Amino acid sequence: MEKSKFRFKIPQYIRWIGWVLLVQFLLINISAAFYAYKLTHVYDDPKLRTAQSSKNIFEKTWRLFTGPRQPRSVITERPTFPYDTVNLKTRKGIDIEAWYSKTDSASRGTVILFHGITANKGMLLNEAYEFRYLGYNVMLVDFRAHGNSGGQTTTIGIRESEEVKMAYDYAIEKGEKNIFLWGSSMGAVVVAKAIDDYELKPSGVMLEMPFGSLQSHLQARARALGFQGFPEKPFGFFVTWWMGIEKGFNGFKHQTSLYAKKVNCPVLMQWGALDNYVLKSETDKIYNGIASTNKKLVVYDRAGHESLLLNDPVKWRIEAERFLSANSK
């Protein structure tokens, strides 16, 4: 008599659970791929800037699943001080526009300013006015896919370090030896990355509200989109992963604290205690990772993710003037 073979039969409900989890995993990845594309592309359609939220439940669900389209930031304000428009070009032929202005008094150096994601150089004019008042030439730069620069794609700070290098080289070619780099949000991250990538030697850097990593930045974007709490973590992970696949880089290595290890020049780092985009843990990790011993962290108790100058003008001016005076050559 032949022995009957024992067969383990998976219960029907477990198979259904398995299929449900598989479908959910596929849908999460499809949605993450859409978001990865949308968050790295800008569109010139002016209707996007005034678009109203659809009341159609199907349209709202589809938009939530695929992510919103981002309009290109438009420059609405120009300097009232004399300036030259500078046109630079990346290695891949992307046009980069900047404004360069000499101070009215004897120059004490040059401050190059870099904006955050979805912003542009026109939004940095308040800071530029302050630096000029302190006796510094200023250069304001539009990153690729922002303002008047070319390109439709941003890498959220990974490849934008080339723009910092080009602006720094431009100031060197003008004969400047006392160069400070100032950046806000993504601009601060890119400044740190450029020092790491190109071994730049500025007289000092001013970093305002840099995010900790691409993944933490995407978690913040998730919070802004309504995915608060637990969902923001898988959102950050999967969108980071898909950005890397779509753009050809390892997004998980995009960490400001790693770049900070190569920052040996004087550093003034500033952050708002009410910032919901950049958390205190990110700020502390970056600051503690900065290689320079000549560094200072200034916290604005009533500020969120915004212009720290406009939030507390007196405090900002005191800190900026002290830092520049102490570190100018």
Q: For the regions a protein language model found, what residue spans apply to each?
A:
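An N-terminal hydrophobic leader/cap segment in hydrolases
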Residues: 14, 24-89
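The serine-hydrolase catalytic nucleophile loop
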Residues: 117-130
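Alpha/beta-hydrolase active-site loop
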Residues: 123, 154-174
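Conserved alpha/beta-hydrolase
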Residues: 131-150
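Hydrolase active-site cap/lid region
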Residues: 193-250, 259
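Short beta-strand/loop motif that positions the catalytic acidic residue
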Residues: 262-264, 269-271, 275
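Conserved alpha/beta-hydrolase "acid-adjacent" motif
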Residues: 276-282
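Catalytic histidine-centered segment of alpha/beta-hydrolase-like enzymes
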Residues: 303-313
